[in-house]
């Protein structure tokens, strides 16, 4: 995410009503996205959702069947890929095995027939940017996976494009290296200030570095927002389930109490929970509507004692711990409620004084969350 280190460069990108089919398969279905100048923007979704196809259309490697792609208001469809203001970093590095790090990075500049002095200046600048200044004479087969990807990033940036397109660039790396390189990539973005468009299926990658995210599925953009908006206020059931873990239920609105502009309490009947719950909702849901309700596992509190009633805004359900899972900084509990529904609860470890008594397998527990911690996702019918 941008921290204001560099002046904003890059360009605004406008994608309007873009569609693309391969035979009978609809890869993109009327997709519209606006990306701001200098933004770190992620296209996030499962395999086959259309995110890479959209990136390839922006890059100029594919042509859409319909729609417009514009850089700073100028339609770039019909302009060759090498004439656009963008460069692409691929998952497989695409390095020349017979060339050194220096020559791989310098290659685009040699095609432009720049002077040796200018080439050397830029190569040194960008090898320093990606922390490879001590490896310039090595061949790709002498580099680690992370170092190879740094070479690919430097080569893509050395032409000084307005837009850097990244097609799952870290997916071939191990988890720790992927995490470290992601931090470096975010730092590079902050330093150079151009527009980054990052394709990934990994929600944690997108949430940790993006200014905004477009969540895609089956060729459509389901939601665009900041990481906080996407996680805390998912627009659809798919987004809620794809981004993190959640408890998701079908519900019926049974009552609404609107006592002020910032006080709109809704009562939901949820058969899977065997009763009703309270939720704060600002969209003025109406009684009788069928909706989806979600509460994140980390929002649910788990205790051995029944929590004291706090007005009518605390939702409490009793159950038995069916499967406790310790995962370091937190424990995950799968609680079988009295009516048979399985509820996920994540408890982050603070310290032994704050954690309270240890909760174990087969313990009877109480799961609770406040009305402000749940969320009505979408109205299924009016």
Residue ranges and their predicted role:
Residues 246, 256-382:
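Non-catalytic connector elements of ABC transporters
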Residues 67-75:
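Conserved ABC transporter NBD signature motif
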Residues 52-55, 151:
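ABC ATPase nucleotide-binding domain helices that frame the ATP-binding cleft
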């Amino acid at each position: 995410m941008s921290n204001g280190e560099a002046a904003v460069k890059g360009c605004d990108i406008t994608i309007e009503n873009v569609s693309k089919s391969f035979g009978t398969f609809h890869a993109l279905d009327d997709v519209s996205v606006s990306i701001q100048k200098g933004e770190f923007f992620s296209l996030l979704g499962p395999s086959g959702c259309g995110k890479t196809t959209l990136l390839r259309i922006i890059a100029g490697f594919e042509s859409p069947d319909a729609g417009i792609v514009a850089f700073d208001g100028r339609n770039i469809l019909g302009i060759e890929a090498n004439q656009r203001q963008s460069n692409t970093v691929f998952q497989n590095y695409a390095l020349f095995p017979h060339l050194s790090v220096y020559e791989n990075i310098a290659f685009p500049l040699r095609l432009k027939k720049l002077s040796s002095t200018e080439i050397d200046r830029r190569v040194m600048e960008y090898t320093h940017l990606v922390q490879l200044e001590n490896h310039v004479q090595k061949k790709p087969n002498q580099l680690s996976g992370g170092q190879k990807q740094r070479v690919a990033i430097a080569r893509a940036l050395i032409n000084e494009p307005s837009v850097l397109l990244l097609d799952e660039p870290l997916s071939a790396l191990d988890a720790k290296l992927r995490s470290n390189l992601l931090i470096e990539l975010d730092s590079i973005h902050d330093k150079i200030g151009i527009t980054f468009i990052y394709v990934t299926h990994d929600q944690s990658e997108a949430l940790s570095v993006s200014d905004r995210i477009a969540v895609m599925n089956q060729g459509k953009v389901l939601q665009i927002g900041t990481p906080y908006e996407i996680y805390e206020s998912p627009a659809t059931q798919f987004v809620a389930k794809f981004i993190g873990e959640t408890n998701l239920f079908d519900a019926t609105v049974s009552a609404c109490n609107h006592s002020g502009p910032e006080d709109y309490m809704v009562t939901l009947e949820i058969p899977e929970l065997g009763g009703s719950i309270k939720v704060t909702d600002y969209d003025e849901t109406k009684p009788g509507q069928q909706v989806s309700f979600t509460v994140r596992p980390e929002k649910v509190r788990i205790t051995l004692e029944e929590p004291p009633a706090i007005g009518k805004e605390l939702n409490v359900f009793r159950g038995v711990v069916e499967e406790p899972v310790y995962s370091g900084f937190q424990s995950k509990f799968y609680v079988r409620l009295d009516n048979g529904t399985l509820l996920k609860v994540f408890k982050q470890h603070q310290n032994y004084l704050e954690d309270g008594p240890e909760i174990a397998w087969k313990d009877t527990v109480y799961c609770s969350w406040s009305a402000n911690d749940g969320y009505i996702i979408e109205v299924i019918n009016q």
